[in-house]
Structures are given as C-alpha cells and as structure tokens.
Amino acid sequence: MVAITLPDGNVKEFDGATTVMEVAQSIGPGLAKATIAGRVDGKLVDASDPITQDASVEIVTAKDKDGVDIIRHSTAHLLGHAVKQLYPNVKMVIGPVIEDGFYYDIFSEKPFTPEDMAAIEKRMAELIKQNYDVIKKMTPREEAIKIFEERGEDYKLKLIADMPEEKELGLYHHQEYVDMCRGPHVPNTRFLKVFKLMKMSGAYWRGDAKNEQLQRIYGTAWADKKDLQAYIQRIEEAEKRDHRKIGKALNLFHMQEQSPGMVFWHPNGWTIYQVLEQYMRKVQKDNGYQEIKTPQIVDRSLWEKSGHWGNYATNMFTTSSESRDYAVKPMNCPCHVQVFNQGLKSYRELPIRLAEFGSCHRNEPSGSLHGLMRVRGFTQDDAHIFCTQAQIQEEVANFIKLTLDVYKDFGFDQIEMKLSTRPEKRVGTDESWDIAEKALADALDSSGLEWEYLPGEGAFYGPKIEFSLKDSLGRVWQCGTIQVDPNMPERLEAEFVNENNERETPIMLHRAILGSFERFLGMLIEHYAGWMPVWLAPQQVVVMNITDKQADACQNVASELQNAGLRAITDLRNEKIGFKIRERTLERIPYMLVLGDKEVESGQVNVRTREGENLGVMSVADFIELVQKAVAQKGRLTTKTDEE
C-alpha cells in the first residue's frame, strides 16, 4: 500500500507502486489530461516515474512556472528531433532552458541559414501534429554509450564521460530520436504547440574559444498563444530599444574590432556619462564617502596576496616590465585596503567609507561581449566601507536607503532585494555568519520593503544583498550590491585599534549602486528608448531661427541658457523650421526654442517639446525656471519631496 498526500491534505491510497499520472487520473480526467510532471516530496519528476513509497505529491501543469520550463526543455528536444531528421549528419551537443526559452548547440560542417531555421520550425510543427508520446527510459551506462556510439553523437559521449559516477542515465525517446537528460519532460508532444524559433548564433564547445565552433539555435515556448504573442511584442520593442542602435542614431558611442569590449565615447554619450559621474560624486560626498584614486596596473604580489592571481588569473590582463609581472586591475578592493592601511586607525575613526570611480578591465570571452552591457573595460561606482562588526547593520541600512533613493532619481521604482546566505563551502565561524546575516536581514527589514532569501548563494567569505531593477519592458537587471567581507582585510593585514587598545581586523563592506557606468547607461538608453529625462539629455535645448535675421538673437539666448547651467545649442541652418524641428525631435532634444521676428521684438521665446507639445511664448527667465524644475525632478515618477 502506497499513501499519497495531496497539497490540500487529502490522502489517496494505492495498492502498490504508482505514478504522478495515475495520481492525477484518480483525481479526475481533466487534471490527468493537463498533467505535465509532478513533485514528489518536493522533487520534480516525470509523470511516468514510479512512486514506490508513501509521499507528498503535487501535480505540475502548464499553469505552473515549472510546467512552462518543462515545456521549454521538451521543445529543445523536439528541435533536436527535427534537426536530425532534416540534417542527419549533424551532431547534437546540449539544449538547456534559459530565461523565456531554450537553445540547442549543434555541430554542423555547413552553417545553418535562415531558410534552414524556417525548415526546422516547419518540421517541428509537423512532428507536434503527430501527437506522439515522449518515452523515458532509465538506461544502464554501457547501453547508453552504445546507443550514442551507433548514432555518432560524439558530444553526448563526452558528456557521459563527464559523469563517471552515473551508472544509469535518463534517455528520452522522441520516436526514433534519442536524447539524454535528467528531466523531467512532457509526456506527449501536444503540450509543445506554442513555440517559435527566434535566432541563430555561434558558440564554442564548453564555452572555450579554443574549441570547435558550434551553431546555436534559440527558441521560445509557452503554455498559451497569448503569452507567446506578448513575448514576441516585448522582443520587437526591445529590438527597437537596442542601445547599440540608439547609440548609433544619437551619436553616443561606438565600438570597433581593434579594441573589443572597450567603448569609444562620442561627445553626446560622454556628456551623459559625465552627468552620471558628477551626480554620483555629489551623492557619495553628501553621504560621508571620501573619494580616492588608485593605480590601474599593480604588481602580481598584491594580487597573489588577495587571492585574485590564483583564482581569477584567466580574467586578468597582464603585462611585464623590468622582470616584474603586473595585472591591469579587474577590481578595486585590494587597492582600497592599501589606502586604509596607510597609518594605523582607531575605532573612533570607523566607519571609513572610501569611494572610487574605478576603471577596471576584465578579459571576458569575446563571444560574450554585447555593446555596453558586457564589456572588457568599465568604470564602477565602487566603494568600500571599513567598519566594526557592530556597525554592519547601520551601514547597510543607510546604504539601502541611499541606493533606493538613487534608483528613484533614474526613474526606477520597482526594485527587487535579495539576501544571499552562507554557502556550504565557506570560511569563518557559524557565529560570525549568524551575526552578518542577521545584520543584513535587520537592515532590509528596516527599509519597510519586501525582500527574499537566496539560501546558499553568498560568497565563500560573507553574505550579500543584491538589488535588481525592473525596466519599462518588465526586464529585470541586477545592479547594486553590498557584500560583507571579513576575509580580504585579514589577507591584506588591515587593522585598527579597538576600545581595549588591541589590534583588530575590520569588516569590509564592498558596495556599488549602479554597478558599472557602461552597463547602467546601456540600461538607461533602453529603458527610455533614448528619450532621456531632461537632466540626462546630452543637449537639453536647441535654439532655432526662422530666417537669418534672428541668428544673433538665437546666439544671445543660447548664451543666456548656457550661463544658467543648461546644455544648449543653436541651429541656424538655412532650412525650413519644420524640417529643423523634425530633425531635432529625432535627436530626442527635450526643448526646441523658435525665434521669429515677433519673439525677437518682444524678447521672448516660443517653446516646443520633443513630444510635439507647444508650450507657447514665454520669457527666457521663465523658460530657464521651467527647465531647472524638470532637471531637479530628475527621472522621478513623482515629485521629489523635501523629506527625500
């Protein structure tokens, strides 16, 4: 007798071993038809897996997130089935689930074309119509090896070799096609009707550019057609907002092959960058941070001492001079400890907050580089707080408040906060972890906002809080972080004199709000589709004449605006005013001032916005006040109050 406990507390008894599908059938035919997989004592299993002892069982359907992920994984296998039918000589590699979809890496002598992708998608749809069952077979290791040897699937054999402890492997049969997976998968292809292949790209076996190149086909799959349509609309909107396209259209930056992963900032883009830096400089100064600057290139001895040379060497750019090895810094922390170490500190001086707009370089794989979002050279709004254990909570609480306030200034009010706790492999005592985790949790509670735990996701030396922003397309971007670190100060011999006149190692809090300027700017460009709030716009105002007679007056108005601290330019070209307005609107300049004879005579300006609104005629002083109010508002969705 096997007793199955359902989520509502009801218990169903079966004479012997049963399955998730049989449990669903015992509840009702509608549920059985909708069953994709199940959870047995919390573990995801196939609907056909045997349940041999008493257990708690949940039915997984397409309405569950797990159900949608299983649909996506099974659609990746379906893609493999279609590809092998159309191109029998290719070799299948891996086909995992990713956010909103899946991909499959394939080795093929001949590159796939868009026509091939269309043919694959068509064949997948034909296979789905056959409504065949997906059969799972737990297969002895040697038999699985024989199956893939007979099929010439070299990469599957390499993957099996990576798992020497596995005596039995899960093989999923899509008719004649066989794939290997831990599962679970859908029981029938009728669950896979809502899918679309999205794009193709190159990849490398095991992600290493030294290995052979593979072809990656990306797809998406959903439980409902409406969800697929909404996703495609989001993708199309995201493509329109691609920061690389907008960056080119607005003349913000470019990148080129001679310097992969490094940004060439143009005047417009550099203006936004400088506004960002000046803003963060003021914010940090107002909150007790001291700005410093540390070297770009540092001897390997410091990186060895900090642990980076041993653990991070492949991601570091190195150089040699006069028989000494150096690294271009990939991060700022070891250098900040060197500044702290100059002169013995007293506990009365703590906390000490050291901030740097630190220029860092990391040797990221070339295939992973993506515009401003993934670069090799970047600047962090980096800071390190040296404090006592007792000061952690207050410092973290202040940082949370500051970070959320900064995000509001950029127009982000949907923030996710997550606390990553101790991993299995860690340094330090359980007591020190208890104190650090409680300090971070209490600081999060003091914010009055929702947050969640990420158990086991902390670094080996301490817990951390991550801040993620939701943009205008609903995408989530991880940006800010604050990390407790007692390890690096100890490795680099940082000390202060405590109240008992004894030497003690400080706690170091690594923190960043924006993350990297480059990535944050890429996010802003896509969030606003290039329509930057007035305070961030490279040019805030353009002053335009109707005829040559108003040229001098336009120059005078522009000078007055510039003297008031506004970023203003003139457009005195001998073109029709309608043409100039259209062109400057495409440049996303927030305000356009038009001067004709009437405006010159009255000493006023005619004000239009890039949204096409005519604000009418006003004095230059009134216009300056209008812009200054918009600048003070920043990107906030509501007006900033005195309390904020």
Curated annotation (Swiss-Prot):
Function of the molecule: Catalyzes the attachment of threonine to tRNA(Thr) in a two-step reaction: L-threonine is first activated by ATP to form Thr-AMP and then transferred to the acceptor end of tRNA(Thr). Also edits incorrectly charged L-seryl-tRNA(Thr).
Tree of life domain: Bacteria
GO molecular function, one term: threonine-tRNA ligase activity
Cofactor, how bound (note): Binds 1 zinc ion per subunit.
Region (Catalytic): 242-533
SUPFAM superfamilies from the UniProt entry: Class II aaRS ABD-related, Class II aaRS and biotin synthetases, TGS-like, ThrRS/AlaRS common domain
Enzyme class of the recorded protein, top EC level: ligase
Catalytic activity: tRNA(Thr) + L-threonine + ATP = L-threonyl-tRNA(Thr) + AMP + diphosphate + H(+)
Protein residues bound to Zn(2+): C333, H384, H510
Signal peptide feature range: none
Keywords carried by this UniProt record: Aminoacyl-tRNA synthetase, ATP-binding, Cytoplasm, Ligase, Metal-binding, Nucleotide-binding, Protein biosynthesis, RNA-binding, tRNA-binding, Zinc
GO cellular component terms, A-Z: cytosol
Description of how the protein assembles with itself and partners: Homodimer.
Biological process, per Gene Ontology: threonyl-tRNA aminoacylation
Coiled coil: none
NCBIfam families for this protein: thrS
Protein name: Threonine--tRNA ligase
Keyword Plastid attributed: no
Occurrences of domain TGS (ranges): 1-61
Family statement: Belongs to the class-II aminoacyl-tRNA synthetase family.
Gene3D superfamilies: 3.10.20.30, 3.30.54.20, Anticodon-binding domain (3.40.50.800), Bira Bifunctional Protein, Domain 2 (3.30.930.10), Threonyl-trna Synthetase, Chain A, domain 2 (3.30.980.10)
Cofactor needs: Zn(2+)
EC number: 6.1.1.3
Stored InterPro entries: aa-tRNA-synt_IIb, aa-tRNA-synth_II, aa-tRNA-synth_II/BPL/LPL, Anticodon-bd, Anticodon-bd_dom_sf, Beta-grasp_dom_sf, TGS, TGS-like
Compartment(s): Cytoplasm
